Amino acid sequence: MDTIQIKDKKFTVSIKEQDILKEVTRVANEINRDLAGKNPLFLSVLNGSFMFTADLMKNITIPCEISFVKLASYQGVSSTGVIKEVIGITEDLTDRTVVIVEDIVDTGLTMQRLLDTLGTRNPKEIHIASLLVKPDKLKVDLNIEYVAMEIPNDFIVGYGLDYDGFGRNYADIYTVVDLSLIHI
């Protein structure tokens, strides 16, 4: 499908599944190399990162654990600026190597909140793996070590990303057709 309709918006394919999977495999290989012997805890940020996490973990070959956290800062097509932790972290992170797995880093505010929260639990080190990063939109300085792709400031759906809860199920990533209609 080259074009999809979700609610009142039309989207066109911008990143094909095979290109996504190639970059996810590259990121997994980097993590395998860098974190060998550290038994990392992968902390997947739901809901958006579920596809990225699944494909990433299929390619992680080092001993590891995985858990999930749910934070929210989006409503519709733009960040609300209000970050609310919905599902907390139950694991003991003391002296652990943690890898945050995120679908997209936009402003970075949600990621900074998560880093602050994790930091109070005394991990040995925290790494960030993100499928997508919008470098021109970042408002905070973050060390995102594992980035599959950098993208422009477009509104996108698919591969776990949604528009008001819809569109997460698509294997490709789609960009809204007329961004001028949306105020991000």
Language-model features and meaning:
Residues M1-I182:
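PRPP-associated nucleotide enzymes
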